[in-house]
Amino acid sequence: MERAAQSTDGGGGGGSNSSSRSSSRATSAGSSPSCSLAGRGVASRSGAAGLGGGGSRSSPGSVAASPSGGGGRRREPALEGVLSKYTNLLQGWQSRYFVLDFEAGLLQYFVNEQSKHQKPRGVLSLSGAIVSLSDEAPHMLVVYSANGEMYKLRAADSKEKQLWVTQLRACAKYHMEMSSKTTPGSRSRSLTLLPHGTPSSASPCSQRHLSTGAPGVVSVTRHKSPAAARRAKSQYSGQLHEVREMMNQVEGQQKNLVHAIESLPGSGPLTALDQDLLLLKATSAATLSCLGECLSLLQQSVRQAAPPSHKPGASETILGWHGPTSHSTDQLKNGTLGSLPSASANITWAILPNSAEEEHNSQPEPEPDSGPELVLSEEEQSDNEDKGEVEPGAMEDQRSVILHLISQLKLGMDLTKVVLPTFILEKRSLLEMYADFMAHPDLLLAITAGATPEERVISFVEYYLTAFHEGRKGTLAKKPYNPIIGETFHCSWEVPKDRVKSKWTSPHPPISAHEHPMADDPSKSYKLRFVAEQVSHHPPISCFYCECKEKRLCVNTHVWTKSKFMGMSVGVSMIGEGVLRLLDHGEEYVFTLPSAYARSILTVPWVELGGKVNISCAKTGYSATVTFHTKPFYGGKVHRVTAEVKHNPTNTIVCKAHGEWNGTLEFTYSNGETKVIDTTTLPVYPKKLRPLEKQGPMESRNLWQEVTHYLRLGDIDAATEQKRRLEERQRVEERKRETLRTPWRPKYFIPEGDGWVYFNPLWKTH
């Protein structure tokens, strides 16, 4: 990737790439100080931003042209210079000469400085634009225009980047203010303010991505019906008063935060000058500033509301707070809206302060001596729920909804707090999906039957590679329900003892994948119990634990799911780790999880896994590396996976594997033997669960049963409404906890170090 080189002292000589040498400079427009950026409230620091060896120069009196002054003078740019611009995947970064025209509110670029008097190669309007920093490349900034265009730019150094960001944001802010003062009630463009940066901030520290907890989206939405526009405006006056009250409370909390940070000592492990704390101060202030401007725009729109007798023009627009005007006051006050009422609804995507939260369980905490018996075994029944339903392709109205969503998102945007349309939901919770990874419990329990550490680690790798295919239901990429804080899922499996054998012993008779191996006599089977719980909502952390007392085996795992928008796909990173403990052997196998990707989200979405995961046992010295290969752009196979098991003390590879994680896997051992496993023919052991009427109120299937019911009927509106009710109940409970300053206490898991462990694990009780 070509990158801009830093300038040398005096602006000449350049770096390794002289064509990319940045020569940005501010030019005088002949404006008075009152018309300069400093006069508009933007802090210009001539000393800090001065020319220091080829950098940018800025002064308060000569930064920008006065929009109103200058008479018949030739209009001059506020800033110009060389930046690297990302063009496309093949050409990468290219040096271009950029000119910022403050008076016109335009960012233009040319091939080089000599061609700047010709027609520009590209022009980006800065009115209502968002300027944010990016970690994709050094000294990178991204400019998002209000019409959806985007420029990815790189400066030569941090000072150069800072100058451009400051001036671009000042220009965007100025023109947004001017447009809101002139015709606030008759604008026809669509403006979206996203928490990737804010044009209202001139602080250097604030010019980075806002935290993921930042508030969401304020959109200007066109209403075709003038009557609907008048009704919407009349509804907002009282609602905005409540928003103002909430803003006042948040401002007070932000002041307390700043005071607490500034009260920290000047030395020690944590000081008031800590980089992360400075960023926290800046982003919180910038967020409030942005929200304040949005609220001012909304208030101006309400004041401009026409009387009932007035007939506005067809182009009149409504400033909407997070969504359609028909939503309740409580939703507006919370700053959140539920998912789409239907696939063709009038939508504005809202970013939630918390990811799909619902009411927490009011059941008492488990007693410390209650043991790991989570549910009554005699109440459990085999799960007969049909998982093989055929899903149709994306319908046209659904595709338009997804396309609208994509237009609201930015590359790399965190989707953890984005409300997704209900029709893309899978009919199960994420906690149940983790349980479905255990659909081959015979392979898991067979690990303990290995006679040597080598046999056991290879058996674990075999189980690991065959676990993921059953966790994915159907061919289409569907999103499971986001577990709410306090949600739990319980199930178990019964595995006939004659099915649990080491791979080195004589193989047992094959069973069809459509057969469900069951033990008629419970005494002739092993019992594997499973419990999962959502222990945190920010970040969203799920924990699950399973154990088999008879085999003295248990698995404890915590996973933080972090999703990211990647254009035509969505990536989900599963951050965390699991530990498999074999108590009879004193071995602990630590493992991580791959990332998941939903591809082709506009047509027929499909899922693939990607990334490198590690499995290691400190006691035996064995480790394994498993690589899930994503499909390349051109050619290549899908769902490919490779693995290698190694004995670290002797640096010996004892096993290699390759194939497809949802198809055929071939294992080659150190003794020359090979083994082929077809995951599609492996027997699937059904889960055993209690019926819904005997499940607790916070157990996944009971909690989501109404949503699941309406999704099965195809009633998206009703499913969306049920989901919204769950979310609203949870927000009420969360506000109660905040008021009482009562921290959330998970029911079955406790924090330990950087992770979470089951409160009464097998290794502590046996």
UniProtKB/Swiss-Prot annotation:
Composition bias type Acidic residues, residue spans: 366-383
Database matches in Pfam families: Oxysterol_BP (PF01237), PH (PF00169)
Protein name: Oxysterol-binding protein-related protein 10
Entry keyword set: Coiled coil, Cytoplasm, Cytoskeleton, Lipid biosynthesis, Lipid metabolism, Lipid transport, Lipid-binding, Methylation, Phosphoprotein, Transport
Record gene name: Osbpl10
SMART domains membership: PH
Binding-site residues, a 1,2-diacyl-sn-glycero-3-phospho-L-serine: 415-420, 482, 563
The UniProt record lists the keyword Iron: no
